[in-house]
Each structure stands twice: as structure tokens, then as C-alpha cells.
């Protein structure tokens, strides 16, 4: 049995910076890790879809995870994504995560195969046995094709390693189900435009790709809601962030936007691996305008809170 892990704060699913030839830009990845640690995020995730895991081999994903784990060791927990179409690949990633000293694994449904809930649970428990690490489930039916429903949750709950779930369904009723009927599984927000609602229902963590380039603003929302219970300030910060979430979620170029956001901070993110391509000039300009407005609005909210004597964390970069 793995040591119980508490999910609190902002967890960043890291992008993968590439050179022009498609090879890993590990220097830029190191810069990003250091920037995020300095900004105060609470954990890092390697090998998620934001990191373009679908375009990387198992060996490449393990190389990245090992690099991130070694870089962050002792400073932040590192969670390794194990999602893959083939169960043996997920097991190899889970075994690798354990061997490198990762703190936990992120475990999703194998895409495309559309397993039953019982089959999906059997798959998850096989990966659990290989990892013997804390597990954060990843429910994203829009991408995986299958919901992690009540039958699945009941079956995997036999393992005390299952400590959390990244809930990305977008269905608010799922949040109600998880918090009311599965309190032993910590619920983490995985749908950015519902972060406020997740915190209102007691979630203590948020796995958010936008924190790759706006960590301070995401931390500010978490601290206002989850730490201080100040949902008045939280609503104002959330309102300022919604235009960014609309660009990320509705534009059809989620990862491209996140990578360009990192570029705006001065860190190379590099090209996308096929089949995806980068943003055009107009799309870049539109994203940059949203970022500029968002950062100014959140800074003003935090400054007002500070002037009125309310505790508020500065939106760090």
C-alpha cells in the first residue's frame, strides 16, 4: 500500500518544449520547472495530454518523467501520467514511475477501446499493482469515450492507493456524486471553467494547464476560495479568467494556446508534434490580448484586497 497523499493546491500538467527538429528541449523544460516552483505551484504532472503524450513513445515519456522528477525532487510532488491505448504501455509507465521515485500516477481510461466499467476497473487495478503508488484517476469521457461511473468507482475503491480523481467531464452532477458519495476519493478540478464550483463543493486542488504560463493567477483563485473561503474575491478572479478559459476550451487549439502562453513568458515551447500545428498570427495576437487583460484585472483585484486589509497572495509569475 502506498503512503496516503493529500491533493492540495495548483498542479501543473507540463507542456513538452521541442526543438525545431522535434527533439526535446530539456533546457527550456528545466526553465519552466524552475519558474513554476518559484511561482508557488504545488505539484507537477508529467506525461499528460498537455505534454503531447499521444505523440511520444513510452521511452520518451519515461525520459521526460525522469528528468522532471530529478529536477523537482524534494521540492514539489511529481505525478506521472500513465494513460495509453495499450495496458502493457500503461504498466511500463507505472513501473517506471515507481522506479524513478515519482510521488503518484495519473490514471485514465484507455482511449478508443471503449471498455465496460468492469473492464476499465480491471485495467486500472492492473496498473495499480504495477505502480504501488498513490493514484489520481482521470475522468475525461469526451476524449476517452467512457465515463468512470459508479460501478467503476466502487470496484477501484477496493484499492487504498486510489486517493483522488481529476474530474474533467464538465458535468456538474459528477461533482455532486463524487463529493457526496465518494468522499474517500479527493476530487480535483479538471474543468477550468468550473473551478469556482469545485472549490465551493470542497475540492482542494485544481489541475490546470493554464498554470504553465499564468501560475500566479491560478494560485490566487485557489487561495481565495480553498484557503480563505472568500468566494466574493473568488468570483471576481474567476470572472477575469473566464475569457482565457473560453479561448482554451472553445477554440479547438488547447495545447497550442498553452504552448504559446509559455512562449509569452519568455520560455521556448517549440513546435507541436504532428498532427497538430501551431497558432497563426491572428490567434497568437488574440491570446496575448486576453492574457494582458486578465493579468491586469487580477492584479487590480489583489491590490484592492490588500488595500482593504484582506489577506491576498500576489499573482506571481
Regions found by a protein language model. Name each.
Residues 3-145, 154, 301:
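Active-site beta->alpha loop and helix N-cap motifs at the rims of alpha/beta catalytic domains
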Residues 196-317:
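Structured C-terminal cap/extension of enzyme domains
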Residues 40, 72, 76, 189, ...:
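Residues at alpha-helix boundaries and short interhelical turns
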Residues 2-6, 177, 262, 317:
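Catalytic cores of TIM-barrel enzymes
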Residues 126-130, 141-249:
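Catalytic alpha/beta core domains of metabolic enzymes, predominantly
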Residues 11, 50-53, 83-85, 166, ...:
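Gly/Ser/Thr-rich beta-alpha loop segments that engage phosphate groups in nucleotides
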Residues 25-28, 32, 60, 64, ...:
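General structural feature for long, well-ordered alpha-helical segments within catalytic domains
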Amino acid at each position: 500500500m502506498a503512503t496516503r497523499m493529500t491533493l492540495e493546491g495548483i498542479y501543473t500538467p507540463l507542456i513538452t518544449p521541442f526543438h525545431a527538429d522535434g527533439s526535446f528541449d530539456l533546457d527550456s523544460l528545466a526553465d519552466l520547472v524552475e519558474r513554476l516552483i518559484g511561482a508557488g505551484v504545488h505539484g507537477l504532472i508529467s506525461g499528460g495530454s498537455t505534454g503531447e503524450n499521444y505523440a511520444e513513445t513510452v521511452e520518451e515519456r519515461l525520459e521526460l518523467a525522469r528528468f522532471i522528477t530529478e529536477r523537482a525532487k524534494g521540492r514539489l510532488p511529481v505525478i506521472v501520467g500513465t494513460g495509453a491505448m495499450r495496458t502493457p504501455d500503461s504498466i511500463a509507465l507505472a513501473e517506471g514511475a515507481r522506479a524513478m521515485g515519482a510521488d503518484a500516477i495519473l490514471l485514465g481510461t484507455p482511449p478508443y477501446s471503449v471498455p465496460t466499467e468492469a473492464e476499465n476497473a480491471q485495467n486500472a487495478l492492473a496498473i495499480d499493482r504495477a505502480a504501488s503508488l498513490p493514484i489520481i484517476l482521470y475522468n475525461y469521457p469526451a476524449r476517452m469515450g467512457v465515463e468512470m461511473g459508479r460501478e467503476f468507482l466502487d470496484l477501484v475503491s477496493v484499492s487504498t492507493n486510489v486517493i483522488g480523481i481529476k474530474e474533467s467531464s464538465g458535468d456538474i452532477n459528477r461533482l455532486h456524486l463524487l463529493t457526496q458519495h465518494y468522499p474517500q476519493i479527493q476530487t480535483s478540478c479538471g474543468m477550468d471553467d468550473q473551478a469556482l464550483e469545485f472549490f465551493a463543493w470542497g475540492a482542494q486542488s485544481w489541475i490546470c494547464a493554464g498554470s504553465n504560463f499564468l501560475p500566479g493567477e491560478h494560485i490566487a483563485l485557489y487561495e481565495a476560495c480553498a484557503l480563505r473561503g472568500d468566494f466574493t474575491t473568488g468570483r471576481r478572479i474567476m470572472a477575469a479568467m473566464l475569457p482565457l478559459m473560453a479561448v482554451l476550451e472553445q477554440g479547438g487549439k488547447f495545447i497550442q494556446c498553452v504552448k504559446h502562453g509559455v512562449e509569452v513568458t519568455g520560455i521556448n515551447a517549440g513546435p507541436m508534434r504532428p498532427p497538430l500545428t501551431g497558432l497563426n498570427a491572428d490567434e497568437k495576437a488574440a491570446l496575448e490580448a486576453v492574457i494582458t487583460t486578465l493579468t491586469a484585472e487580477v492584479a487590480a483585484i489583489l491590490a484592492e484586497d490588500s488595500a482593504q486589509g484582506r489577506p491576498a497572495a500576489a499573482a506571481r509569475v
